[in-house]
Amino acid sequence: MGEWDLLGRLLDKVQSHSTVIGKVWLTVLFVFRILVLRTGADRVWGDEQSDFVCNTQQPGCENVCYDLAFPISHVRFWFLQIIAVATPKLLYLGHVLHVIHAEKKMKERMKKQAELDDQTNLFLRKAYKVPKYTKSSGKISIRGRLLRSYVYHLVAKIILEVLFIVGQYFLYGFTLDTRYVCTRFPCPHKVDCFLSRPTEKSVIIWFMLVAAFVSLFLSLVELFYLCVKAAKECMARRQDYTVTPVTPPLLARKSFKSHKEVFQNCVNEPASPENNMEEVHI
């Protein structure tokens, strides 16, 4: 199935921009959900409607009873579930690629600024932002906007996972019965319908359900881990910004100039010995 290969390539790209727990979540998604759905579930549910037999010859009765027992096929339901829980991850990948592109352009501007004279280059470096998400090794640092985006995508995954688990329970429960009783029109009376291989199908249902709960648990653990990490970084920044409240002398306060004023003096005023002496005094 080509759509699975495309989804696999996209999620493999996301893996390089995720936490360790996020990489484990992707492994669970690939091995315990997509792989089982591709190899086992398709074969087991290949005969679901053809082998759904009812003890009546009334035309249309079997189709109506099958629709009542299974409003949506299990395989298609799990397919929608995997697509839904993977979509927030793909949206996060789009944000990461946007940040990488923006900081790549920023690095190119800084490289052009480096060709200017040293004094002007010093002030321009202070005026522009420096890349803070991409490391020298090319990896992404999950912080700031990326951290918020990562947390949002985790919350969306958790909500979608819970909704699909609850939806599966209300649609057809977590086990399959051998016999289904149907009284829908156009069935002439109470009709007994029988399902093929209910035990084997119930085993796969429980397997996919356990995989969904493991995925939900990993998302909750990852969300807790990121919240603790963000709290520690916030406390560390507060300690770094804490300074001793010492009032500077009056002369130092009068002679203080902002970086913008110094830059304007360097640009507008011609170089002279008096200006040089003033700058040395500052």
UniProtKB/Swiss-Prot annotation:
Pfam families: Connexin. Residues 2-13, 100-148, 227-282 are cytoplasmic. Keywords: Cell junction, Cell membrane, Gap junction, Membrane, Transmembrane, Transmembrane helix. Expressed equally in incompetent and competent ovaries. It is a multi-pass membrane protein. The keyword Transmembrane applies. It is found in: Cell membrane; Cell junction, Gap junction. InterPro entries: Connexin, Connexin_CCC, Connexin_CS, Connexin_N, Connexin_N_sf. Gene3D superfamilies: Gap junction channel protein cysteine-rich domain. Its main location: membrane. The chain crosses the membrane at residues 14-36, 77-99, 149-171, 204-226. GO terms for cellular component: connexin complex. GO terms for biological process: cell-cell signaling. One of its GO terms (molecular function) is gap junction channel activity. Residues 37-76, 172-203 are extracellular. PROSITE patterns: CONNEXINS_1, CONNEXINS_2. Belongs to the connexin family. Alpha-type (group II) subfamily. One gap junction consists of a cluster of closely packed pairs of transmembrane channels, the connexons, through which materials of low MW diffuse from one cell to a neighboring cell. A connexon is composed of a hexamer of connexins. This is Gap junction Cx32.7 protein. It comes from Micropogonias undulatus (Atlantic croaker).
